[in-house]
Every structure is written in structure tokens, then in C-alpha cells.
Amino acid sequence: MIVFGWAVFLASRSLGQGLLLTLEEHIAHLLGTTGATATMGNSCICRDDSGAEDNVDTHQQQAENSTVPTADSRSQPRDPVRPPRRGRGPHEPRRKKQNVDGLVLDTLAVIRTLVDNDQEPPYSMITLHEMAETDEGWLDVVQSLIRVIPLEDPLGPAVITLLLDECPLPTKDALQKLTEILNLNGEVACQDSGHPAKHRNTSAVLGCLAEKLAGPASIGLLSPGILEYLLQCLKLQSHPTVMLFALIALEKFAQTSENKLTISESSISDRLVTLELWADDPDYLKRQVGFCAQWSLDNLFLKEGRQLTYEKVDLNNIRAMLNSNDVSEYLKISPHGLEARCDASSFESVRCTFCVDTGVWYYEVTVVTSGVMQIGWATRDSKFLNHEGYGIGDDEYSCAYDGCRQLIWYNARSKPHVHPCWKEGDTVGFLLDLNEKQMIFFLNGNQLPPEKQVFSSTVSGFFAAASFMSYQQCEFNFGARPFKYPPSMKFSTFNDYAFLTAEEKIILPRHRRLALLKQVSIRENCCSLCCDEVADTQLKPCGHSDLCMDCALQLETCPLCRKEIVSRIRQISHIS
């Protein structure tokens, strides 16, 4: 939701600026004077005007800051959470160039309040984005993110990703200048070990840039010094959070094949074998490191002679798990199918393998990270739009609990709940009562009032489901283990009634999945969407006929020409 709202705002801002500039040109033409732009100074936000403000000397800025506000502005205080209006109205003072560190901390302070797509980003985010449009400004923003984001804030790394992901792409010169300023190497990684926030933030910035600049720019960014720095951060002497984000940065650099080869040749797998032993550690920070180390060994940095985790994990008692075939593209799922993590900049979602239609059902989630996750219930009709920022609770077919922002989500609208913010190790309970048509959420056994709004759209076909913001992780219990806080009413568990074959329980690493896909033989006349059924359906009025009837019934527009589908005609009879 946050990312999508920010992107919509940027698009509308650019359009608005263009219209304002066009209007100025017409006024200048009509008045026949070059002073037309100056007469519109209180409403125009063009780049020239912003630049002029940035060059105002310090004494003038101090003088303006000391100006007594008008009576109107004093009588109408602005909501501190609501961002200011764009442009400068009659009651809004001229903008000042603020301290970059202050803007970053302001963004971190209000990030929890960004919940609706139609909500403007805060003034601090807008200003930082404008500053980053120049190389010098972009470098100032990046250095500030490294310098001031505190270690203890659970949303700190997510704010780094959010701000950098929406800033303009850096130029080659800016990247070169950044590497010179940071001057990273193994020795730097050993410095300031008592202040791990700087190293955590540096690794988070590098990971975000590697993800954003995949390709030649990413190859150029991974210099020998930066590689040495990240590898040094993986040593056991480092703070666990530094180890975690150094590993995530290496994962993102490895999205480019040349970088993956370079990193693999550094014997990184030997270090990860030790770190994967932390996957079940009671320290939740170390547990994150262990999860990512195990995932990297299974998916990216393979070690010769090491058995892949899915080949040795015991799944005998597990009958319901997260569905690796019903998940958005960047979510990481553990080999036992009960733990998930997102390290991408998108909002990743997953449903479980078991669907319920009647009765009373309950499952629990252990919070491993205390950031933004939306966890609850969803039907098959609930859509995963990870790049647009939509997940569980963002349509009429799902409802979700958000313990970080203390919200209940339904149909992309939120309302506050009275539970405190969740923290690492908390247990969240999810009760679905299809007899009474209600959902009840629990935090460490304390329940909220029932939620019923989702039943106005659907009354059956519910799955346990969750969506994850960047760097978030949790573990699910569908009944394979005793519950920590079972509700007092009688209920059923997925694990008691579900069934999975041995093959359905396997969660293959990505390289194994790709290898299997290469072996798949696709028939000439198969559906172009599912590739399973025969393409036997013609769409009207466009006439395209590359789909089966099952897929055609799920579409409103033709995937080839985007024309609206009025009718569907089955052309041939066949045996599937």
C-alpha cells in the first residue's frame, strides 16, 4: 500500500508541474513580460524556483524562519500526521531547505501512518525525493540514511529501501562518487564494531542498490573492496543484524550472474554452513541469519557435497503448509513450509494449502520480526499485486491483522485495534468461525472483538494467508505442534483434516524448479496461459483463440489485444 500510494503521487505531481509550466508560458505570452513567472511564485513549484530557494543564504533563511505566522495560520494548526499541501497557498510559508538528517528521521517517525493509497506521502519524503534529483543531493540522502537510521527501529531498513527505491536512479558518476566516499574494505568492516547501526545501514543501502541496478551497474558496484567488506561482516564477531543485512546484500548482488560467480568463488558457502545452524535459534535475530543462510545455500551459493535442506527435512507430521504454488514471486519459504520471509522491496503474499468452507478453525503465527505484515484469511479470489503494494486485507475477499501499525485491514481500508504493537516472539492467533460468520484475532491470548465485514462478499473457501513488507519474517503453526494460546471454544485445525502427498510437500529450490520447467514438453495446441488444457475457446468479438475455457472464464479482457470479452465459444470437444 505504501509503495503504490507513493508512486501514484509522483506521477500526479509530474503531471501537475507540467500543467503549471504550460500555464506560465501562456500568461507570459499574453502579458508580454518576462516577469510572469515571478508573479506566480506563490503557486509554482518548478525546478528553477526550488533551486533558487536552495541557494538562499543562511542569514536570509534565519530571518524567514523567525517571521511571525499570520493569524490565519495560528488559528488553523496543521495535523502533524497529515502532509502539507503541494504548492504554496496563502497560509503556507515558503519552503526551507531542511537538514537532510532531520528529514530522514521525520520520515521514519511517520512511516507507520502511511496506510491508504490516496494519502499523500509526508513532506519529508517529498523533499528528500526532490533533493535526490541531483547527484549531490542523492549522495547526501544516501549518506544520511547510513548515518542516522537507528539500530533499534524495526522499520529502519524498510525505510532505507522505500526511500532509495523511489528516488531517481543514480548516475554512473554518482555511484562512483559513493564508492569513493564509503571507501569500503575488510578493515572498515572491523571498525566501529560497538556501533553496528552504521554497518547495518551500509549493507542495506548496498543491497537496495544491487536490486535496483541489476546488470552492468550492479557488476560495477561490486568492487573487490565492497565484496571484502560484506564478507568480513559475515564473520561471527560481527553483530547479528550486520551479518543479516550483509548476507541479504550479497543475495541481491547475486541476482546478476557475473556477480553470483564472483561471490561463489569467495568460498562464501563455507561461512554460510556455520550460520545456517542458527535457523532454529531462540534468539530471533540469529534465527533470521540462519534462515537466510540456509536459503542462500539451497538457492544461490551451493556447496559441493552438501545435501539440500528439502531432501533431509522431516515432513511426516505436516499435513498443511504454505503453498509454494500459490505465492508471489519473491517470497522465501522454508523447506518445511511453515516459515516465510520477504527481503524484496515489493509486498509479497502467500496462501496455505488447505481451504475451509464450514466450521470453526484456528491457527497461530509466531512473530520473528516486528515490522509490517498483514496476516489473516483470504479466499482464492483475493489477488496478490505485490508490485502495486496490495496484499491480504486489501480487497473484499480477505481480512488481515497488522500488529506493527495496530490495524485491521479489509478491502484496502484500515481501522485501529487496541492491541499493543507486536514484538519478536509474540504469538498471534487467528480464529475463523464460519457458523457465526466472524473472524477473531488474538495477541498472546488476548482477543479483539469479532470482524464480520468480509462475509458480505464471501462466506466460504478461506485460506490462511499473509503479506510481508521488506525484511519481515514469521512462522506458522497449523496444528502440527500444540498451540500456545488455544481459544476456549471448540475448533478444528488444518493439520487434523488436510492431506498432502509426499510430492506436494516438497518445496524445491529455485534452480531445481527451473531445471524441471526446462524438461516440460508443451503441446502445440495447449492453452497459452495454463499450458495444461487444450486451447479450445474463441473470444468474441476479437476472435483470438489461444485459451482453454477455464482460463477464458477468468478473464474480462483478451490478454493479446486487451479488447473486452463479450462471449466465449468452445470450438472443439476434447478429452483432457
Swiss-Prot record:
InterPro entries to which the protein is assigned, alphabetical: ARM-type_fold (IPR016024), B30.2/SPRY (IPR001870), B30.2/SPRY_sf (IPR043136), ConA-like_dom_sf (IPR013320), RNF123/RSPRY1-like (IPR045129), SPRY_dom (IPR003877), SPRY_RSPRY1 (IPR035774), Znf_RING (IPR001841)
Keyword annotations from UniProtKB, A to Z: Glycoprotein, Metal-binding, Phosphoprotein, Secreted, Signal, Zinc, Zinc-finger
Query: Which residues belong to the signal peptide in this entry?
Result: 1-16
Q: Region annotation Disordered: residue ranges?
A: 53-99
* Composition skew (Basic residues), residue ranges: 83-97
Q: Where is the composition biased (Polar residues)?
A: 58-73
Tell me the ranges covered by the B30.2/SPRY domain, including all copies.
300-483
Q: Does the keyword Cell division apply?
A: no
SUPFAM superfamilies referenced in this protein's UniProt entry, alphabetically: ARM repeat, Concanavalin A-like lectins/glucanases, RING/U-box
User: Can the keyword Phosphoprotein be found in this entry's annotation?
Assistant: yes
Tell me, using the record's free text, what induces this protein. Up-regulated in response to denervation-induced skeletal muscle atrophy. Induced by MYOD1.
SMART domains, sorted: RING (SM00184), SPRY (SM00449)
Q: Per the record, GO CC terms?
A: extracellular region
On tissue specificity, the annotation reads:
Expressed in embryonic bone during primary endochondral ossification. Strong localization is observed in the perichondrium and periostium (at protein level). Also expressed in embryonic and postnatal brain and craniofacial tissues. Expressed in skeletal muscles.
TM region(s), chain numbering? none
Q: Identify a single GO molecular function assigned to this protein.
A: zinc ion binding
| Post-translational modification Phosphoserine, affected residues | S50
Positions bearing carbohydrate:
N65
Q: Where are the zinc fingers (RING-type)?
A: 527-562
Localization per Swiss-Prot or TrEMBL: Secreted
Q: What name goes with this protein?
A: RING finger and SPRY domain-containing protein 1
* Name of the gene: Rspry1
